[in-house]
Swiss-Prot record:
Organism phylogeny: Bacteria, Pseudomonadati, Pseudomonadota
Membrane-crossing segments per the record: 14-34
GO cellular component: plasma membrane
Primary location class: membrane
Keywords recorded for this protein, A-Z: Cell inner membrane, Cell membrane, Chaperone, Lipid degradation, Lipid metabolism, Membrane, Transmembrane, Transmembrane helix
Domain of life: Bacteria
Membrane topology: Single-pass membrane protein
Protein name (record): Lipase chaperone
UniProt xrefs under InterPro entries: Lipase_chaperone (IPR004961)
Annotated segments matching region Disordered: 39-78
One Gene Ontology term from the biological process aspect of the record: lipid catabolic process
A Pfam family assignment: Lipase_chap
Species whose genome carries this gene: Pseudomonas sp. (strain KWI-56)
Protein role: May be involved in the folding of the extracellular lipase during its passage through the periplasm.
Family classification: Belongs to the lipase chaperone family.
C-alpha cells in the first residue's frame, strides 16, 4: 500500500467533519465530471428527524436492510431517505438528488439496465404503492438524461479554471442542460450550486481584471459579497474558517508536532472540543491505516491465488465485510480498492 492509499488528507477531513462542520463548497464541484457520488454509511437521517423544511421523509419501516441485495460498492450502507410533502408527493428537495447520487455510486458495479433496476428497487423500498413512487422514477429518468447529456459535452463539460470564458460557457451549458432535462427539478437539484458557481466566477473576474487597482478590486469584491443572501454569507464564513483551520493543521503536521502539542495549539484557536475531535480523528486515522494495510496484504494474496474473477471478487468482498464492520467502512475500502486497481 502506498503512503496515500487508504487515506484523505487528515487536515481537510478534520476540518470538514470534526472542526467546523460540513459546508457546501461548490465552487470547484462544477468543473469535475458528470456527477458527485456521495460517500455512504452515515448519510441518512435518523427516523426521528422525520420533518424538515416542510417535507416529511418516507416511512422508515419501508426501507430495505442495508445488507439486502446491495452492490459491492454500497455494502454496509443504506440509502438516504426520499422526502415527501404534506400531500404525500415527492418533495422538490436537494435530498432527492442525494438519494440518486447514492445509487450512482454503484454504477461501476452495474450495467445501465442493472443500475436502473437497482434504483427502482431502492425507490420501491421506501415508496412502494404510493403516488411518490412514480414521481421518483420520473425524476430518475430525467436525472439520467441530464447526466447522459453532460457526458456528451467535450471533456464532460469540464473547463480550464484559468480560462474564465470557458468557465462561463461550461456553467451556462450545464445550467441549460439541467433546465432542459430536469425542468422544475433543476432548481432544487442545482440551484444553490449554480448560484455559488456564478458568484465564484464573478469573484475570479474581478480578481483577474488587469484594469483594476488592488483598491478597486477590494471595493468590488466587498460590494459583491454584500449581494450574498444571509445564509450564503454564513456559508462563506464557514469556508473561510475551514481554510484557516486546514492551513493550521497542515502546518502542524508538516512541522512534526506531537499529538499533544497539536491539541494544545488547536485548543487555543479552535477551542477544546474541536481540538479533541481532531485528536480523536488522528487516532481513528492511525487505526484505519493499520487495518487497511492488513486488509490490503490479504487482498493481494487472494488476487495472486489464481482464482476465477468471480471467486476472487467474492472472496475479497467477504474479506472486506469481516475486516471493516463499522458503518461505511466497507464502502470506503471498496472505493480505495478501485482507485488502487486503476493505479496499478
Amino acid at each position: 500500500m502506498t503512503s496515500r492509499e487508504g487515506r484523505a488528507p487528515l487536515a481537510r477531513r478534520a476540518v470538514v467533519y470534526g472542526v467546523v462542520g460540513l459546508a457546501a463548497i461548490a465552487g470547484v464541484a462544477m468543473w469535475s465530471g458528470a456527477g458527485w457520488h456521495r460517500a455512504t454509511g452515515a448519510s441518512g437521517e435518523s427516523p426521528e428527524a422525520s420533518v424538515a423544511g416542510g417535507s416529511v421523509t418516507a416511512p422508515p419501516q419501508a426501507a430495505v436492510p442495508a445488507s439486502t441485495g446491495l452492490p459491492p460498492s454500497l455494502a454496509g450502507s443504506s440509502a438516504p431517505r426520499l422526502p415527501l410533502d404534506a400531500g404525500g408527493h415527492l418533495a422538490k428537495s436537494r435530498a432527492v438528488r442525494d438519494f440518486f447520487d447514492y445509487c450512482l455510486t454503484a454504477q461501476s458495479d452495474l450495467s445501465a439496465a442493472g443500475l436502473d433496476a437497482f434504483v427502482m428497487r431502492e425507490i420501491a423500498a421506501q415508496l412502494d404503492g404510493t403516488v411518490a413512487q412514480a414521481e421518483a422514477l420520473d425524476v430518475w429518468h430525467r436525472y439520467r438524461a441530464y447526466l447522459d447529456a453532460l457526458a456528451k459535452l467535450r471533456d464532460a463539460g469540464a473547463a480550464d479554471k484559468s480560462d474564465l470564458g470557458a468557465l462561463q460557457l461550461a456553467l451556462d451549458q450545464r445550467a441549460s442542460i439541467a433546465y432542459r432535462t430536469l425542468g422544475d427539478w433543476s432548481q432544487p437539484f442545482f440551484g444553490a450550486e449554480q448560484w455559488r458557481q456564478r458568484y465564484d466566477l464573478a469573484r475570479l473576474k474581478i480578481a483577474q481584471d488587469p484594469t483594476l487597482t488592488d483598491a478597486q478590486k477590494a471595493e468590488r469584491l466587498a460590494a459583491l459579497e454584500q449581494q450574498m443572501p444571509a445564509d450564503e454569507r454564513a456559508a462563506q464564513q464557514h469556508i473561510d474558517q475551514q481554510r484557516a483551520a486546514i492551513d493550521q493543521i497542515a502546518q502542524l503536521q508538516k512541522s512534526g508536532a506531537t499529538p499533544d502539542a497539536m491539541r494544545a495549539q488547536l485548543t487555543q484557536t479552535l477551542g477544546p472540543e474541536a481540538a479533541a475531535r481532531v485528536a480523536q480523528m488522528q487516532q481513528d486515522d492511525a487505526s484505519w491505516q493499520s487495518r487497511y494495510a492488513d486488509y490490503a496484504a490479504q487482498r493481494t494474496q487472494i488476487e495472486s491465488a489464481g482464482l476465477s474473477p468471480q471467486d476472487r471478487d467474492a472472496q475479497i468482498a467477504a474479506l472486506r465485510q469481516r475486516v471493516f464492520t463499522r458503518p461505511g467502512e466497507a464502502v470506503r475500502a471498496a472505493s480505495l480498492d478501485r482507485g488502487a486497481g486503476s493505479a496499478r
